[in-house]
Amino acid sequence: MGLEKSLLLLPLLVLVLGCVQPSLGKESSAMKFERQHMDSEGTGSSPTYCNQMMKRREMTKGSCKPVNTFVHEPLADVQAVCSQEKVTCKNGKSNCYKSSSALHITDCHLKGNSKYPNCDYKTSNYQKHIIVACEGNPYVPVHFDASV
């Protein structure tokens, strides 16, 4: 009797796992933003910061990402930008917001002679306003548009 129940429940289990599984490994836009742009604990002060972080945050897999910015502020402060000054995004969309104050950021630029898989970055630290695109519910950053 136990075996019959197990055999009857197996197709149901397969069906449920088939529906749930595809979403398990999928990184949301908000999670991708955090992985690619947030470093609340860091300062970016080391000359090798960008080389280390770009690799650690998986932005040198398959190719070298040419430019990236890390924000060294609490996540809540960056999320709050989504309720600050509304501006037009570089792509013309209207879901971008500019921070009301300058934030501590690190820009990483791929050096001209650098070739994959040896991605070599120039590290530059700034205090600048950031512009982020926001989406979702809750309304959170999903794209780093610029720093000004």
UniProtKB/Swiss-Prot annotation:
Gene Ontology terms for molecular function: lyase activity; nucleic acid binding; ribonuclease A activity
SMART domains to which the protein is assigned, alphabetical: RNAse_Pc
Residues forming coiled coils: none
Record flagged with keyword ATP-binding: no
Signal peptide: 1-25
Species per Swiss-Prot/TrEMBL record: Gerbillus nigeriae (Nigerian gerbil)
UniProt record similarity statement: Belongs to the pancreatic ribonuclease family.
Main location: secreted
Source lineage: Eukaryota, Metazoa, Chordata, Craniata, Vertebrata
Assembly behavior: Monomer. Interacts with and forms tight 1:1 complexes with RNH1. Dimerization of two such complexes may occur. Interaction with RNH1 inhibits this protein.
Pfam family, one: RnaseA
The keyword Transmembrane helix is annotated on this UniProt entry: no
GO cellular component: extracellular region
Protein's name in the database: Ribonuclease pancreatic
Cellular localisation: Secreted
Disulfide bonds: C50-C108, C64-C119, C82-C134, C89-C96
Enzyme Commission designation: 4.6.1.18
CDD domains: RNase_A_canonical (cd06265)
InterPro entries named among the record's database cross-references: RNaseA (IPR001427), RNaseA-like_dom_sf (IPR036816), RNaseA_AS (IPR023411), RNaseA_domain (IPR023412)
